[in-house]
Structure formats: structure tokens, C-alpha cells
Amino acid sequence: SQYDNGQLWRVGDQAATDAAFKSAAHVTKIDLINNRLIPNAMETRAAIGYYDTGTEHYTLYTTSQNPHVARLVISAFHGLAPEHKLRVIAPDVGGGFGSKIFIYGEEVTCVWASKRIGGRPIKWTADRSEAFLSDAHGRDHVSHAELAMDASGKIVGLKVHTVAAMGAYLSTFSSCVPTYLYATLLSGQYNIPNIYAEVDAVYTNTAPVDAYRGAGRPEATYL
């Protein structure tokens, strides 16, 4: 990466794409910004954590779009409890759009704290300001693209360099969104024989980004 706070990801045949550009009759260039956005569902995130002192089992009610993954991640990476002693239930999720796939610290804290106070359930609901500040955001790409064409106007090559802001730390699927779910789909419905893409994923002092409404595919379609 050209940035100290980033990682570079590449896909495509750079040599073949460079050759296509070298022999092209026309080359057009464009710079695009895909703005950062906040999902802002009408129903904010909420969680209830409960620890059963008799069975030593944990139960988490949470507005998660992916309760099975939440159970796996909370068990494997947060070390709260083995999976067979942890239930994650997603009743009324409300609007999600991808932002409720990420495993948030508040959910884990509710079940962790319930054990610390003798098994009393703990409820947490985000207010609107918290949702704006802490929910996983979406998009935030700055891209430079070049398109090569032959004399008849047929596309023979595409080069793309995208700077994707990851936020202060990685969320559940953030590294997949601007790479495999974006750069591999840049051709869209067109037959482009040579494509080379570079993605600079950089850390920024902002909320982390994650999957949002198509997760990389809309960004590719826009470009």
C-alpha cells in the first residue's frame, strides 16, 4: 500500500491489461467518490443478555441479521462460553440493510455482565445518536478508473484504483466488501477481456464500515 495505515489488494492480470492500454486507440479516465453513509434503520440496535446460574447457560436476544454467526463469533473470538452453552435469538430485527450483521460490543457486554450480577437480565437499546456514531457505516470509496477502447469503440481494458476507508478497525465482513465483492464485479454486463484492479484498504478515525445494501456490488455498478 502507498499508505502507512493501509493494505493493498490486487486482482487481475496487470501485464495483459497494460498491453491492452498500450495498443488502445482511445483511453478515457474518471475519478469517482462513493460517499460514506449511515444505515440509520428506524429500529435501533437492542439486546437483552441473561445468564442462568443453574444451567450455566447464556442467552442473548439481539437485533442481529445473522444470529448463527453471532453465536460462533461470540464463542470463538470473545471467549464468552462454548457454543453449546450459548443461545442467540433474533426475534424482531427491524431494519438492518447489512449493518446488523456486525457483532457489536454492546451485545457481548449484556450477557457478560448478567453473570457478574448473579444472573439478572440486562437490557440495552441504542439511542439515535449512538446509532449514528457506532453502527457500522457503508461505502466510502475514492476511485480512479481508466477505460481502453479500440478504434471501433470496443472496450479492451479497464484499470481501477480504489481507496477504501475501513474505519478505525475491521468489522465482520469489511475486508470482503471492497475486494472480492467489488473488484471482481467491475465488468458488470460488459465483456471486458482485460481488467486490473488495486484496492488500498486504509484505516481512518471513523466508525468501521461493513456490508450495506449489496455490499460492494453497487459500488462496482456505479463505477
Label for each model-derived stretch:
Residues S1-L223:
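Structural alpha/beta core scaffold segments of enzyme domains
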